[in-house]
């Protein structure tokens, strides 16, 4: 697309990645799209998701990230190797890859883990062949610059960052304190993912693959110190996975309210953080985290269908 005029290249980039994003949301919701409410509203809810407009305004990669993340998780059971390739293609977003290998190992998803690893190695090899080994020195230098200027010093604006690290810095905390707080959040997110994805876990009702997928996306946002407002686009597949897992019988009124708040929040997150110091995006991500964990832990505490049958016998 570098050969195209800028406006045309931008339109093609955003249009193609937006189409991928919508296709993935449709695939996630396919099992429940016969429901009247879902059939009427899913496309409108996905297309009008406020984070989508934030991403469009920045011309950024939120649609692609949401599409790859959602597709990789949707393909995990039927096409594990393809799932791994899709995870591997997310290597351009390394801050979102912190928990993915942990989840795959905890869940015993060896083929997906292998596929992701091979894809990342292949991409790294292709970059080296195309640009030479100096590309990695440039990458390391740019990473250091991004860490110092954009993250620690907040040159991008702490109100634009939607992470625990940024919240502490926005409230006047030092860099060391912000790293400690972020590390604590990352450890909690990691342990939650291991709990949810560990091999032999329950895969029925709301404790199924869809809820595990939603939790991984949400925990990824909690674990990363570098989450920009347009990155909240990946909440769309997380919300879709939760709806697919729990709709309609396992939703309570407060569940629906929480999902509605998460849907609206990206529209105001940056402005509210800048005006009041309240990290709305982070609060919504944390709220979704507790919602997913509540459903998961409730299902884990209930006897399985097989156990119930044995007890009845």
Outline where the language-model segments fall.
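Hydrophobic alpha-helical transmembrane segments of integral membrane proteins
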Residues: 46-47, 90, 97-98, 234, ...
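Transmembrane helices and adjacent periplasmic/lumenal helix-loop junctions
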Residues: 87-104, 225-231
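Membrane-embedded alpha-helical segments of transport systems
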Residues: 92-95, 122-127, 257-258
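Generic structural signal for short, solvent-exposed loop/turn connectors between secondary structure elements
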Residues: 76-80, 93, 268-276
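Aromatic-enriched
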Residues: 241-313
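Primarily membrane-embedded glycan-assembly and transfer machineries that use lipid-linked glycans
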Residues: 1-82, 104-236, 243-244, 248, ...
């Amino acid at each position: 697309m570098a050969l195209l005029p800028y406006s045309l290249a931008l339109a093609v980039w955003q249009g193609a990645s937006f189409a991928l994003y919508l296709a993935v949301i449709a695939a996630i919701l396919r099992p429940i799209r016969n429901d009247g409410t879902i059939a009427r509203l899913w496309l409108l809810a996905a297309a009008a998701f406020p984070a989508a407009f934030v991403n469009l305004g920045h011309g950024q990669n939120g649609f692609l990230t949401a599409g790859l993340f959602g597709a990789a998780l949707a393909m995990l059971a039927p096409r594990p190797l393809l799932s791994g390739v899709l995870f591997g293609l997310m290597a351009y977003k390394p801050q979102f890859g912190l928990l993915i290998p942990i989840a795959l190992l905890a869940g015993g998803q060896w083929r997906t883990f292998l596929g992701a690893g091979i894809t990342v190695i292949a991409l790294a090899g292709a970059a080296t062949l195309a640009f030479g080994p100096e590309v990695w020195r440039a990458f390391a230098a740019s990473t250091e610059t991004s860490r110092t200027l954009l993250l620690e010093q907040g040159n991008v604006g702490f109100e634009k960052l939607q992470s625990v690290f940024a919240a502490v810095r926005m409230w006047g905390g030092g860099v060391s304190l912000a790293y400690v707080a972020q590390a604590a959040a990352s450890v909690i997110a990691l342990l939650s993912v291991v709990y949810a994805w560990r091999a032999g876990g329950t895969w029925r009702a709301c404790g199924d693959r869809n809820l595990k997928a939603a939790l991984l996306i949400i925990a990824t946002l909690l674990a990363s110190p570098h989450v920009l407002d347009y990155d909240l686009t990946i909440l769309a597949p997380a919300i879709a996975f939760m709806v697919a897992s729990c709709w309609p019988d396992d939703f309570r009124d407060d569940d629906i309210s929480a999902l509605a708040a998460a849907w609206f929040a990206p529209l105001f997150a940056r402005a509210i953080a800048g005006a009041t110091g309240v990290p709305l995006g982070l609060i919504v991500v944390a709220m979704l985290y507790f919602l997913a964990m509540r459903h998961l832990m409730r299902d884990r505490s209930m006897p399985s269908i097989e156990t119930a049958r044995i007890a009845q016998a």
